[in-house]
């Protein structure tokens, strides 16, 4: 996975519309330049979400990003950072959602891998063992990843709260501390 030479990216103050895929993709490409990937976003208060009805629910807008994003090419293979087993998986196919999603169970926590190619879910089964270093998924393009420029949303989750195949990736500002405690920084899992 191309994170060793990646550039840092903050979307905290980015002036892009998440509903305008073409403009958002140009912004990401310009930020990336010749780097293999862009990495960042954990704990950011992203005003780009406040501009979108996708993240406002029925009350306070959700703007606190709970995972780390790795912006790179569709089709990029993903390898498990640690031994795991498949907890759950599904296609979350609403616009702005995760698209292909896999949740892995590790020793004492889970990881959510979002914006995946749908083929990543082919042949998976709950309880399936995934060895550290094993390729288990691929990044999806906009047609299958929720309508985003290609990227991985990686989120560590200490308690799934009963969820299967999905979990909030963005939280309201007023609940920032609670959600970040539940979803610690996953950057150490990037390999």
Language-model regions: role of each:
Residues 80-120:
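Zn2+-dependent peptidoglycan hydrolase active-site motif and core
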Residues 32-34, 58-94:
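Short, glycine/small-residue-enriched coil/turn segments at secondary-structure junctions
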């Amino acid at each position: 996975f191309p994170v060793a030479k990646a550039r840092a990216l903050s979307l905290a103050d980015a002036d892009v519309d998440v509903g305008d895929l073409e403009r958002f993709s140009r912004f990401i490409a310009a930020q990336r330049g010749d780097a293999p990937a862009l990495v960042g976003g954990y704990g950011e208060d992203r005003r780009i979400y406040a501009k979108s009805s996708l993240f406002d629910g029925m009350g306070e807008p959700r703007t606190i990003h709970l995972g780390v994003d790795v912006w790179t090419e569709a089709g990029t293979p993903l390898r498990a950072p640690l031994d795991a087993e498949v907890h759950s998986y599904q296609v979350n196919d609403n616009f702005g959602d995760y698209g292909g999603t896999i949740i892995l169970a590790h020793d004492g926590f889970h990881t959510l891998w979002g914006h995946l190619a749908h083929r990543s879910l082919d042949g998976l089964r709950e309880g399936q063992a995934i060895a550290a270093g094993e390729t288990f998924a691929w990044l999806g393009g906009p047609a299958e990843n929720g309508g985003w420029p290609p990227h991985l949303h990686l989120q560590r989750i200490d308690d799934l709260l009963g969820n299967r195949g999905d979990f909030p990736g963005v939280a309201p500002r007023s609940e920032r501390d609670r959600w970040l405690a539940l979803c610690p920084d996953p950057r150490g899992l990037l390999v």
